[in-house]
């Protein structure tokens, strides 16, 4: 197998591929243009979106030429893949702002030049609908489209005609990139398989050449939960939506059984180093988790920020060092009040989702103020609890928050 493809396979990226042997031989002979698309439904990607772009970085290291297709036009329709209901229709202004934000985010992570980023509005916004149906729609079988899991699943919930067009438009994207950029490979999550193979088929029919598609597994944790979700919601790559400290801690808290898998997927460490790290046992496995958390934080947020939150994590768990990057909640006593119920403070700071959960944690001995366990659910915080205008609130073993006056 081609070296680049073999690397993706060994690191756990490869799920399905059209004509793998033919693609491998082609990549042995020449450096190919390949692409992954991203819709602009949000101002930020989350960690679950990152896999295709990490794979792109591996392929780029082997000399292949990436294109990131910004789906500013297809976002106006919405991809039904993996959805049980129609996406909310966004305004053009929101879509354009999201497109710029995501492009900047991916440029920072991948270090790809601006020329690697293309918007599909370049060709989709001015399509003539009648000509599109005559030239492109004629190559699509409704029966075949309905055989794909994306559409089969949605038929039970309702599928709008506008969403039904999505596969044609994504296939047209691939066709256009093949036509103007000689792009020969589309990569994406496995939920995109139907859209990708339809594009491969359209290129064969329209251009008379073979193109290829490759998908990655949808990453889940060993507990069955979807990768990229946390108690605080989606693990966004934008630090204003999900703090860098919490991002680091998300990976620092990886379950033992996921460490090796995530080291292969979310870092660029060499195979022998990963195998060595993965053999850590007992408490030493925490070191492997620290390495994982540092490496992926470095990729997404840069080495300087990764070092800061790593030091903050060490300070929180070991009780010494620079604590300034531990998340904080700005608090002030209201009016003449000189105390506040701890339960209320926990809820205000969002370290717990409800007062009942706060009471449960206190009663089970899982809440600490400045390292001292809280015994009473009616415990009050006073000014005397603050040292240098802050206190440390810990919930459970892993949640730390500085309360700052």
Curated annotation (Swiss-Prot):
Positions contributing to L-tyrosine binding: 35, 166, 170
Family per similarity comment: Belongs to the class-I aminoacyl-tRNA synthetase family. TyrS type 1 subfamily.
Binding site for ATP: 229
Motif ('HIGH' region): 40-49
PROSITE patterns the UniProt entry points to: S4
Keywords recorded for this protein, A-Z: Aminoacyl-tRNA synthetase, ATP-binding, Cytoplasm, Ligase, Nucleotide-binding, Protein biosynthesis, RNA-binding
Catalytic activity: tRNA(Tyr) + L-tyrosine + ATP = L-tyrosyl-tRNA(Tyr) + AMP + diphosphate + H(+)
Quaternary structure (record): Homodimer.
Function: Catalyzes the attachment of tyrosine to tRNA(Tyr) in a two-step reaction: tyrosine is first activated by ATP to form Tyr-AMP and then transferred to the acceptor end of tRNA(Tyr).
GO molecular function annotation: ATP binding; RNA binding; tyrosine-tRNA ligase activity
GO cellular component: cytosol
Annotated protein name in UniProt: Tyrosine--tRNA ligase
Single biological process term from Gene Ontology: tyrosyl-tRNA aminoacylation
S4 RNA-binding domain boundaries: 340-404
Pfam families in alphabetical order: SYY_C-terminal (PF22421), tRNA-synt_1b (PF00579)
Record localization: Cytoplasm
Top-level taxonomic group: Bacteria
Main location: cytoplasm
EC number, as in UniProt: 6.1.1.1
Short sequence motif 'KMSKS' region: positions: 226-230
């Amino acid at each position: 197998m081609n070296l680049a493809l073999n690397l993706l396979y060994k690191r756990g990226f490869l799920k399905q591929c059209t004509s793998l042997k033919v693609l491998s031989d082609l990549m042995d002979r020449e450096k190919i243009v390949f692409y992954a698309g991203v819709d602009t439904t949000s101002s930020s990607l989350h960690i679950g979106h990152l896999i295709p772009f990490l794979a792109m970085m591996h392929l780029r290291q082997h000399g292949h030429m990436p294109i990131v297709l910004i789906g500013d036009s297809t976002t106006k329709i919405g991809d039904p893949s993996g959805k049980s209901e129609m996406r909310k229709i966004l305004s053009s202004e929101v879509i354009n702002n999201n497109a710029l934000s995501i492009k900047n985010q991916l440029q920072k992570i991948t270090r790809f030049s601006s020329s690697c980023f293309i918007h599909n509005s370049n060709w989709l916004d001015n399509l003539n609908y009648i000509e599109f149906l005559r030239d492109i729609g004629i190559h699509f079988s409704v029966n075949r489209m309905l055989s794909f899991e994306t559409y089969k699943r949605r038929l039970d919930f309702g599928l709008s005609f506008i969403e039904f067009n999505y596969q044609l438009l994504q296939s047209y994207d691939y066709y256009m990139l093949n036509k103007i950029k000689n792009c020969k490979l589309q990569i994406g999550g496995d939920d995109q398989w139907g859209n990708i193979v339809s594009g491969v088929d359209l290129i064969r029919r329209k251009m008379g050449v073979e193109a290829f598609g490759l998908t990655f597994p949808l990453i889940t944790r060993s507990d069955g939960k979807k990768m990229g979700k946390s108690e605080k919601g989606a693990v966004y790559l934008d630090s204003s939506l999900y703090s860098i400290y919490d991002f680091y801690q998300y990976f620092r808290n990886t379950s033992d059984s996921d460490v090796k898998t995530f080291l292969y997927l979310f870092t660029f460490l060499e195979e022998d180093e990963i195998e060595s790290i993965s053999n850590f046992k007992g408490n030493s496995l925490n070191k492997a988790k620290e390495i994982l958390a540092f490496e992926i934080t470095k990729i997404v947020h840069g080495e300087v920020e990764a070092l800061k939150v790593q030091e903050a994590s060490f300070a929180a768990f070991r009780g010494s060092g620079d604590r300034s990057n531990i998340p904080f909640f700005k608090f002030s006593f209201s009016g003449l009040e000189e105390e506040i119920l701890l339960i209320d403070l926990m809820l205000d700071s969002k370290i717990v989702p409800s007062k009942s959960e706060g009471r449960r944690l206190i009663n089970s001995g899982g809440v600490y103020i400045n390292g001292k366990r809280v015994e009473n659910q009616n415990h009050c915080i006073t000014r005397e609890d603050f040292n240098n205008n802050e206190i440390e609130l810990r919930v459970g073993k892993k949640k730390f928050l500085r309360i700052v006056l």
